[in-house]
Curated annotation (Swiss-Prot):
The lineage of its organism: Bacteria, Pseudomonadati, Pseudomonadota, Betaproteobacteria, Neisseriales. The gene is penA. The active site is at S128. Transmembrane segments: none annotated. SUPFAM superfamilies: beta-lactamase/transpeptidase-like (SSF56601). GO terms for cellular component: plasma membrane. This is Probable peptidoglycan D,D-transpeptidase PenA.
């Protein structure tokens, strides 16, 4: 910019290292102001260049995500939305977009809603997008196997009833994932103490700052396990009662894509692959990835996110919003998050649509199509080869 100073975002947060230092030279001038000699002086100094910052953002993926998000926000007459795209093996941020947004060349014309970087600063309750982690915890402990079957009829915890959108008398663990069963997920969570589940969520990064370098990033919200009611342990297992940003949620999914290790996220290109923190066993992460493919197959809640030519592991989420301390039935956040190729993930895409008011509100309906186009285009841009035969009607959107 013309001011030579960082105004917002990464440029502002890294201003001290990017700006460099001016040099100084003591000179002798004649009576007309012309320099006639340079003098030795302790005040002389050599100018220093600022440090380079090479961003990991891919302009092609960024443009694709921005266009698809804006179309969805308009079509569903939503309040807002956001998309995050991560490298599934390094944690590098390939795209991060928000809607509404503004022209950074004309910041004075933007209002506060347009200036918010929602994917980093805003907390959401992820809803069913948290279920893969509850399932992972149960599998990792050895308490269950993917073929174990559970009674998934509605049941009570105190005065509250835990139930599913559709009634399923029994489901195995794969079915709990595919059908997005609140009942099944809550029963898996009940196998552990509140402290064990709290520690697990904490290890996933919930309630912990990411130190991404972006100003205003939220830590999310995870209340002390000592304050949990019995029903809260159940609801947290399917994404109510804890909060995190969309970027935090995408980061948590690196546990599944990077063989059980939580990766740091970065807006800068990484010269060396970062070291992750072990959360679950590599074998568990592989099992969960396999289960999540069923979500985008026939009978799954995320069929709208299926990408031709690829096995896609994904999860939908639909959460009612908390207004004045109560969950309301007319305001929702729809989420769709997943990775591909499922066996050896290269990309994580996370989409959230806030308060859709037209043409549906479920995560699979409002966020699924955005996920599909962004994932398909990202894989194509990155040159990832298909993992299964292509149909004859496939089209891929790639910005020029």
């Amino acid at each position: 910019n013309i001011d030579g100073k960082g105004q917002e975002g990464l440029e502002l947060s890294r201003e001290d290292s990017l700006r460099g230092e001016d040099g100084a030279k003591v000179v002798l001038r004649d009576n007309k102001g012309n320099i006639v000699d340079s003098l030795d002086s302790p005040r002389n100094s050599v100018p220093k260049n600022g440090q380079d910052m090479i961003l990991s953002l891919d302009q092609r993926i960024q443009t694709l995500a921005y266009d698809e998000l804006n179309k969805a926000v308009a079509y569903h007459k939503a309040k807002a939305g956001a998309v995050v795209v991560l490298d599934a093996q390094t944690g590098e941020i390939l795209a991060l977009v928000n809607s509404p947004a503004y022209d950074p060349n004309q910041p004075g014309q933007a209002n506060s809603e347009q200036r918010r970087n929602r994917a980093v600063t805003d907390m959401i309750e992820p809803g069913s997008a948290m279920k893969p982690f509850t399932i992972a915890k149960a599998l990792d402990s050895g308490k269950v196997d993917p073929t174990d079957t559970f009674n998934t009829l509605p049941y009570k915890i105190g005065p509250a009833t835990v139930q599913d959108t559709h009634v399923y008398p029994t489901l195995d663990v794969r079915g709990i994932m595919q059908k997005s069963s609140n009942v099944g997920t809550s029963k898996l969570s009940a196998m552990f103490t509140p402290k064990e589940m709290y520690d697990f969520y904490h290890d996933l990064g919930v309630g912990v700052r990411m130190h991404s370098g972006f100003p205003g990033e939220t830590a999310g919200l995870l209340r002390s396990w000592r304050r949990w009611q019995k029903i809260e342990q159940a609801t947290m297992s399917f994404g109510y009662g804890l909060q995190l940003s969309l970027l935090q949620l995408a980061r948590a999914y690196t546990v599944l894509t990077h063989d059980g290790e939580l990766l740091p996220v970065s807006f800068e290109k990484q010269a060396v692959a970062p070291k992750g923190k072990r959360v679950i066993k590599a074998s568990t992460a592989k099992k969960v990835r396999e289960l999540m493919v069923s979500v985008t197959e026939a009978g799954g809640t995320g069929i709208a996110g299926a990408v031709d030519g690829f096995d896609v592991g994904a999860k939908t989420g639909t959460a009612r919003k908390l207004v004045n301390g109560r969950y309301v039935d007319n305001k929702h956040v729809g989420t769709f998050i997943g990775f591909a190729p499922a066996k050896n993930p290269r990309v994580i895409v996370a989409v959230t649509i806030d308060e859709p008011t037209a043409n549906g509100y479920y995560g699979g309906v409002v966020a699924g199509p955005v996920f599909k186009e962004v994932m398909s285009g990202s894989l194509n841009i990155l040159g990832v080869s298909p993992t299964k035969p292509l149909s004859n009607t496939a089209t891929v959107k790639v910005p020029s």
